[in-house]
Design a protein with these regions (language model features):
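S-adenosylmethionine
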Residues: 1-176, 180-182, 189-544
Length: 544
C-alpha cells in the first residue's frame, strides 16, 4: 500500500508573511522542480535564460541553492522526514523541494537568517498552489532551525569532512562553473543507453574486485579528510555525506573505507574552477582586471581561479582561455603526446579535448564525431576557427566507415560520471547499479570501433570520468580479448613526453607516475588532485 500523501498540517499559516519571494529562490525552486520531474539537467537549466537573466548576486545564490540542495538532498530528506507527523508520508514534489530549499539554507548557509529561509519557504509553498501545506512547511522548518543552528550543524558536519571554506565558495562565483563548464565525455551519464546485441555483457552484481590493493598508498595520504571517523560503517558514511548507500559500499570495497570517505567528502564541495590558457599573456590581462589566479597543480597551461569573474573577461570572450578541469586537460595532453597526422575524436563534444589536439598537432587533420544533434551544433561552432583542418561530423562513431585510417583515436566515452559528483551532484540521484551494464555495453562498442579505425602501429586513448572498474579496466580487458593484435602500453612514456615539452613539471610527473596501475593506466581520484575523477589508458595496434 502506498504511503499517505502529506500535504499539510490542517492549520493555516501565519498571516504576516511577505508576499514577495526573492528571484534567486524562485529560480532555484523552478530548476529543482524540473530536475525532480526528470524534465532536464541542472547544468542545462542553470545556463538557461531564467537564471542567466538574474543579477550576478541572485545568479550566484540561485546556483548555490540548486547545487547545494542536490549535493545534500539525501541527508536533507532524512532530516525532514524525522520531523513530519507521518515520517513515511509521500510529499508532493513542490512541497518536497520547498522543504529541501529551506532546510539547506538553515543548515548550510549561515549568512542567511533562519527566519528569512522559513518565511520565503512558506511563501513558495503558497505560490506553488499548496496554501494549506504552508503551515506544515513553517512547523517543520521551525523545528529544524531550533534543533540545529547553522554553527552547530557545520560543527557536526566537520567530523565528516565538510569544511566551512568549501561551503563559502557556494556564494562566490559559483555560477561561473555552472553556466560555462560543459560536461566532458560525450555527455556523461545517459540512463537511456540500451545494450547492444553485438557486445557481451560485462557487469554482474558483485563481479568487481578490490582495486585498493593495486592503488598506491599515495592516495590514502592525499584523500583522507580531517576528522575521519574509522568506526563508521559505509551506510553511516553514505547518510552523513548524502551519497547513495550502494555506491559508498562499492567504493569502500574497491578503494578502502578511508578513500571512500574522501571521495564522498569531495563530492560535497564546490570543485576548483580551472582554466586552460591558450595564450599565456591572457593571465596578465586577467590579473590587471582583478581576477586572481594560481598555477595549476600539474600542467603549465592550467590555472585555478581564486577570485573574480573569468567568464565576463575579454580574454574569455575572445577565446584566449576556456574553462576546463585540469584532469580533462591532462587526458587531451596525454593523447596529443602521440605524434599523429590523422586524428579521430570519437565522442568530441563539447570540444575541449579536440581543441587541445588541434593546438598540439598543427599539421594534423582531425575528425570530430558527435552523435547528439544538440551537442553537435555547439561543437561545430566551437571548432569553426580551424577551418577544413578539423571536420565535424554528426555521426555515431561505431558506424564510421574509415577502418585503419587514423594514427590516433581519442575515445573519451560517455560514462556514469561518478568521478564528477561534486560538479554534477544530481548523478547520484539518477544512477542505479543496473545502469552500469548499459553504459559498459556502449563503451565497449565505442572502444572496439576506435580500435578498428586506427591504422597498424597507431594508438587509441580510452578515457572516462568514472570511478567504476566496469567502465574502465573491465571494458579495456574485454576489448583486448576481442583484438589480439592490440596491446596496452604504459602512459609513463606520455608523462615523460609532457615533461620534456615543458607542459608538465617534475613534481607533477612524479605524482602521476605514482598513480599508474600495473598495466600503465592512469586513475585520478578526486582529492588526490584538485580534479574530477578520471581513468585513462593507452592501447596500440601492432604494426604489420
Amino acid at each position: 500500500m502506498n504511503a499517505p500523501r502529506q500535504s499539510g498540517s490542517g492549520k493555516s499559516a501565519p498571516r504576516n508573511r511577505p508576499e514577495a519571494i526573492s528571484q534567486a529562490r524562485k529560480a532555484a525552486f523552478n530548476v529543482l522542480l524540473a530536475v525532480e520531474r526528470g524534465q532536464s539537467h541542472s547544468d542545462d537549466l542553470l545556463r538557461g535564460k531564467t537564471v542567466d537573466s538574474l543579477s550576478a548576486p541572485d545568479r550566484n545564490l540561485a546556483t548555490a541553492l540548486v547545487l547545494g540542495v542536490l549535493r545534500w538532498q539525501i541527508r536533507l530528506d532524512h532530516q525532514i522526514q524525522a520531523l513530519l507527523k507521518h515520517p513515511n508520508a509521500k510529499l508532493d514534489p513542490e512541497i518536497q523541494i520547498t522543504l529541501r530549499l529551506g532546510a539547506f539554507q538553515i543548515l548550510h548557509m549561515d549568512r542567511i537568517p533562519a527566519r528569512a529561509a522559513i518565511d520565503e519557504s512558506v511563501e513558495l509553498a503558497k505560490q506553488a498552489g499548496h496554501r494549506f501545506a504552508s503551515g506544515m512547511v513553517n512547523a517543520v522548518l521551525r523545528k529544524l532551525a531550533s534543533r540545529a543552528q547553522p554553527a552547530e550543524a557545520v560543527s557536526a558536519l566537520k567530523g565528516h569532512g565538510f569544511s566551512r571554506a568549501a561551503e563559502r565558495t557556494y556564494g562566490d562565483g559559483a555560477s561561473q562553473a555552472a553556466e560555462k563548464l560543459d560536461p566532458e565525455g560525450g555527455g556523461g551519464f545517459n540512463p537511456r543507453i540500451k545494450p547492444t546485441e553485438s557486445t557481451p555483457a560485462l557487469v554482474a552484481e558483485g563481479s568487481f574486485t578490490r582495486i585498493s590493493s593495486k592503488t598506491p598508498s599515495f592516495f590514502a595520504a592525499c584523500l583522507a579528510p580531517e576528522g575521519s571517523l574509522p568506526e563508521e560503517s559505509p551506510a553511516d558514511l553514505a547518510l552523513a555525506q548524502a551519497h547513495p548507500a550502494w555506491l559508498v559500499e562499492r567504493w569502500a570495497a574497491l578503494y578502502g573505507f578511508e578513500a571512500a570517505r574522501a571521495l564522498c567528502h569531495h563530492g560535497q564541495i564546490q570543485p576548483v574552477l580551472t582554466i586552460h590558457l591558450q595564450d599565456p599573456s591572457a593571465a596578465e590581462e586577467l590579473a590587471a582586471a582583478g581576477i586572481q589566479l594560481q598555477p595549476g597543480e600539474l600542467l603549465a597551461c592550467a590555472r585555478a581561479v581564486v577570485s573574480g569573474d573569468v567568464t565576463g573577461s575579454a580574454a574569455f570572450r575572445g577565446g584566449r582561455l576556456r574553462l576546463q578541469d585540469e584532469g580533462s586537460q591532462l587526458i587531451a595532453e596525454l593523447a596529443a603526446a602521440n605524434p599523429a597526422q590523422r586524428i579521430l575524436d570519437s565522442c568530441a563534444a563539447p570540444g575541449n579535448k579536440t581543441l587541445i589536439l588541434a593546438e598540439r598537432n598543427p599539421s594534423a587533420r582531425i575528425l570530430a564525431c558527435e552523435s547528439s544533434p544538440q551537442r553537435f551544433e555547439a561543437l561545430r561552432e566551437r571548432l569553426t576557427p580551424f577551418g577544413d583542418r578539423v571536420e565535424c561530423r554528426l555521426a555515431d562513431a561505431t558506424t564510421l566507415a574509415e577502418d585503419s585510417a587514423f594514427d590516433l583515436v581519442l575515445a573519451d566515452v560517455p560514462c556514469s560520471g561518478t568521478g564528477t559528483l561534486g560538479r554534477n551532484p544530481e548523478i547520484r540521484h539518477r544512477l542505479r547499479l543496473e545502469d552500469l551494464a548499459r553504459q559498459t555495453e556502449r563503451q565497449l562498442a565505442l572502444l572496439l570501433a576506435a580500435l578498428r579505425a586506427v591504422r597498424p602501429g597507431g594508438r587509441v586513448v580510452y578515457s572516462t570520468c568514472s570511478l567504476e572498474p566496469e567502465e574502465n579496466e573491465q571494458v579495456v580487458a574485454a576489448a583486448l580479448a576481442h583484438t589480439p593484435e592490440v596491446s596496452q602500453i604504459s602512459l609513463e612514456s606520455g608523462i615523460e613526453t609532457l615533461l620534456s615539452q615543458g607542459l608538465l613539471g617534475n613534481s607533477g610527473a612524479d605524482r602521476l607516475r605514482h598513480c599508474l596501475d600495473p598495466n600503465g593506466a592512469l586513475r585520478l581520484l578526486p582529492g588526490a588532485f584538485a580534479t574530477d575523477g578520471f581513468y585513462v589508458c593507452l592501447l596500440e595496434r601492432e604494426s604489420q
